[in-house]
Amino acid sequence: MEHGFVALVGAGPGDKGLITIRGAELLSQADVVVYDRLVSQEIIKMIPTTAEKIDVGKENKFHPVKQEEINHILLEKSLEGKKVIRLKGGDPFVFGRGGEELELLYENNIPFEVVPGVTSAVAALCYGGIPATHRDFCSSLHIITGHAREGGQLSIPFHELKELNGTIVFLMGDSSLSYLMNGLINAGMEKDMPAAIVENGTRPNQRKLVATVGTLEQKALEMEIKSPAIIAVGKVCSLSEKFSWFMKKPLFGTKILVTRPKESSGTLVEKLRQLGAEPVEYPCIEVVPIPQNEKLYHACENIREYGWILLTSKNGIQIFFDYLNSKGLDARVLANTKIGTVGSQTAKALKEVGLISDFTPEIFDGRHLALGIAERVGENEKVLICDAAIASDDIVNILRSNNIKFDRVPLYNTNYINENSNKVKKSIVHGELKYITFTSASTVEGFIASMKDIPLESLTAVCIGNKTAEAAKKYNLRYVVAEKSTIDSMIDKLLEIGGGNIYD
């Protein structure tokens, strides 16, 4: 068997947007991914589901998997002919032991590549509003490890650092803070020299402390600063508040529970993240196509009988057209059939399969879709309703009351799931979660089913529409309703939620 390949990929300090294009490309091709604690969950989610994931869990002062063992894991997996990605927080060669990991690969003639990563020494400062250099304050940057090798002692040339008058950055130095600050003071640095700590830099739970060399240690104790944290010393730290941008985002640090199915949550999660929020993905439902769907089979066999097809979700569109394709059919069989969609996102999904919706109501719900179709359907035209197995009867009732012929074909079941419910329950009980988003009545039902005996009074639900709000009201949840039944409108409601409009 031919040898495999190993890539040391810098994952950056946490924000998934900071991994390089090359790093993401290699990660998408991985057979095996070896990663540790400093790699954020957002980047771990980028690992292909087909790849073997090996968590070596290295933490400050606690290395459950020794470095020598990690080196051998990389070697063994590559000798199996696999493409191995060693995913490392920050940059592999900035105190990342990347050189140590390459030595064994080099000795065994294993092909390798190193992809640089954005180091926290610069990125965490940037997200804290601190420029690493500024011509009015300094012209050099010095990155120092604040963590001694196992069995060794730190030996930092404080006098030389002090004389350079540059920005000093200590990585992994939170446990050595007293030694570092006293070392600088004893070397003659003024106690009022600006200094800062950025904890969890570039992440939604980032915290920042700006003080002086003389006060940083005490204030860090008071704030209970924890790893990962970087320490910066220099006049540039005085610019932190002036240049702060990340922590001034409108939803910065706000934990928001997202209950959509995994395959549908991406847009909402990404938009929340861009606003500084910390979205917590907790899919409460999963969409499962109905197997051996006889009703769908007969509908597709007689598809030309229908003057209109009504599609009520993105999932329904995907399942319907996947089924058509599986039978050797495509959109051409719908040449004489009009299509109605329940909302803008459903219409967009239809456009992605090459078709344009003939009708989408201004108010995005089944009732208004049916009312619009009742006005448009021709005499003796038959309507095909494609929706979920458990769905509102609004469309059926309105078509029936207007004497419109129809067939209803359920395309999928909506199952409740509760993965990681204990973690979410703890966050709710401890008051860490403030808001929860519901994009359908079924997400409300699924959430409630997984939260038995958990007090929910501290949560405010943001509902995509009135039907969803009715479900929230049924369980006495505090809620607000988006002005329009869209993700963007839900986000607008989150941005204004402090102003009220909360119905008990």
From Swiss-Prot:
Region (Uroporphyrinogen-III C-methyltransferase): 1-248
The entry's keywords: Lyase, Methyltransferase, Multifunctional enzyme, Porphyrin biosynthesis, S-adenosyl-L-methionine, Transferase
Swiss-Prot/TrEMBL GO biological process terms: cobalamin biosynthetic process; methylation; siroheme biosynthetic process
Domain of life: Bacteria
Gene Ontology terms for molecular function: uroporphyrin-III C-methyltransferase activity; uroporphyrinogen-III synthase activity
Functional summary from the UniProt entry: May catalyze sequential reactions to synthesize uroporphyrinogen III from hydroxymethylbilane (HMB) and then precorrin-2, which are intermediate compounds in both vitamin B12 and siroheme biosyntheses.
Lineage: Bacteria, Bacillati, Bacillota, Clostridia, Eubacteriales
Region span, Uroporphyrinogen-III synthase: 249-504
Record flagged with keyword Isomerase: no
UniProt catalytic activity: uroporphyrinogen III + 2 S-adenosyl-L-methionine = precorrin-2 + 2 S-adenosyl-L-homocysteine + H(+); hydroxymethylbilane = uroporphyrinogen III + H2O
Protein name per its UniProtKB record: Porphyrin biosynthesis protein HemD
PROSITE patterns: SUMT_1 (PS00839), SUMT_2 (PS00840)
EC number: 2.1.1.107, 4.2.1.75
Pfam families linked to this entry: HEM4, TP_methylase
Pathway stated in the Swiss-Prot or TrEMBL entry: Cofactor biosynthesis; adenosylcobalamin biosynthesis; precorrin-2 from uroporphyrinogen III: step 1/1; Porphyrin-containing compound metabolism; siroheme biosynthesis; precorrin-2 from uroporphyrinogen III: step 1/1
Similarity annotation: In the N-terminal section; belongs to the precorrin methyltransferase family. In the C-terminal section; belongs to the uroporphyrinogen-III synthase family.
